[in-house]
């Protein structure tokens, strides 16, 4: 109703879960910014909001038309048939925006900021900085035409881009150069030739629809791809030695057969809803799939060429709940409301239990006897420590971009260095 009339505010997925999409208007965000500004004036220790009090109630139009200022601010899970009494107390994801309506930050279900963006004040919508949680910010510079001319990496390789007619030159901070030659336009521009930093050259060919039809490597070896004119499906591949592999499809564009250069054929068959019911290998061995009912998307059993049958039970969310092998040995699986595996139960009482933190990272694996292995992470999500059941601790240190630079175990430290 009102400003949100005609907007989608709820979604129900195929498993019956219901999600609420929280939409906000520019005026609502402006009012919230003014409240924060007022609060910051009365509390000097409180950081002043980015937009201060200059948060406009409306947004100017764009080249695509008026901007009503409506943005997605949060997604909530409001109904879960499998966990009706255990709904999350916080949104699954949350978004904040600048005073110009640009995406400012993304927060996960633990309310941890996982991505952040910076924009050019003189060019609304032009991103000049991007950062993942625990990582340095990547910066971007543009030319007058709005093209990226420099990508600045404070902890690694940076890149400079030079644009010419049908040619882009990419130079990294070690002065290594790659040249991309392009053809086409109006959305069909494609890279047809690459000059790599080591002096080698590769070529690519495309059809009138911009689909890849040939590739020539640095040694001059050419691979060709035949395409169905209508669907774009690959119908044949011819390798540099002239050997051809053919592909066949049904009316639903599902692969039904592959004929290799030696003449041997592998086949796939589907039922009317399009589910895979059998696969026959090049050697003639067939695996068959059976489904519980006409609506099941995942197979209940598979039977191989020897007649051995395996059984699977699935949750309404497509998670494997039980697997029984051909000897009758069964393994069962349990999951939490976020779809993460929490337990594995095997025969003879052999079980493993898993726990996760509020960001969904694995923090503990415990067996039925209570032996526990614990895991620790840094802000970027890198695994920094593993503590085994006997108390031994191994640690890993990382650089700014997540590459391991040292490992320590049993008092012994190993260091790693990298080139660029």
For each feature predicted by the language model, list its residue ranges.
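Extended charged/polar low-complexity repeat regions
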Residues: 1-420
